[in-house]
């Protein structure tokens, strides 16, 4: 399971050091794609396969489904972790997520999310994070 929050610096070549716990779960090669909320999603090859199977079931007659699939798959790339534990974030993905100098890498169960520092701090101060609202949503979900 992928959990935790880590802050890292992006080097001049657009690389970040992937936390060792995440490298263990993701493997030497993994898929990085555009995520929701202007962050990036990273999946192990195994989890990507599971996700693909679910997404294959979306109705191609649905414009929204086709748009989502294009967004999700066109932005995807296979990344490789080098011997120093670094991974290159492609320029188009850095631009999409607003990544410049520093990033937050978080674990969300079966995926990682890579956030620009600015976007992550905004997300964490968002009014949606009130304890009462979260508690209410958890109750609605049966948690």
UniProtKB/Swiss-Prot annotation:
GO process terms (BP): negative regulation of DNA-templated transcription initiation
Keyword annotations from UniProtKB, A to Z: Cytoplasm, DNA-binding, Repeat, Transcription, Transcription regulation
Residue ranges constituting the SpoVT-AbrB domain according to the UniProt record: 5-47, 76-119
Ranges in coiled-coil conformation: none
CDD domains cross-referenced by the UniProt entry: MraZ_C, MraZ_N
A molecular function GO annotation: transcription cis-regulatory region binding
One Pfam family, short name: MraZ
SUPFAM superfamilies, alphabetized: AbrB/MazE/MraZ-like
Subcellular location: Cytoplasm, Nucleoid
One GO cellular component term noted in the UniProt record for this chain: nucleoid
Subunit text: Forms oligomers.
NCBIfam families, sorted: division/cell wall cluster transcriptional repressor MraZ
Family statement: Belongs to the MraZ family.
Protein name per UniProt: Transcriptional regulator MraZ
Taxonomic source organism: Caldicellulosiruptor bescii (strain ATCC BAA-1888 / DSM 6725 / KCTC 15123 / Z-1320) (Anaerocellum thermophilum)
Classification lineage: Bacteria, Bacillati, Bacillota, Bacillota incertae sedis, Caldicellulosiruptorales
This protein's encoding gene: mraZ
């Amino acid at each position: 399971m992928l959990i935790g929050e880590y802050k890292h610096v992006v080097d001049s070549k657009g690389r970040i050091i992937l936390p060792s716990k995440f490298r263990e779960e993701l493997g030497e090669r993994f898929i990085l794609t555009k995520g929701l909320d202007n962050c990036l999603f990273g999946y192990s090859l195994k989890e990507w396969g599971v996700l693909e199977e679910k997404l294959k079931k979306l109705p191609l007659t649905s414009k929204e489904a086709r748009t989502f699939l294009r967004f999700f798959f066109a932005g995807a790339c296979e990344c490789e972790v080098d011997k120093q534990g670094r991974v290159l974030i492609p320029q188009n993905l850095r631009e999409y997520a607003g990544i410049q100098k520093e990033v937050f890498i978080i674990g969300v169960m079966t995926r990682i999310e890579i956030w620009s520092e600015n976007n992550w701090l905004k997300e964490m101060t968002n009014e949606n994070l009130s304890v009462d609202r979260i508690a209410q949503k958890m109750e609605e979900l049966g948690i």
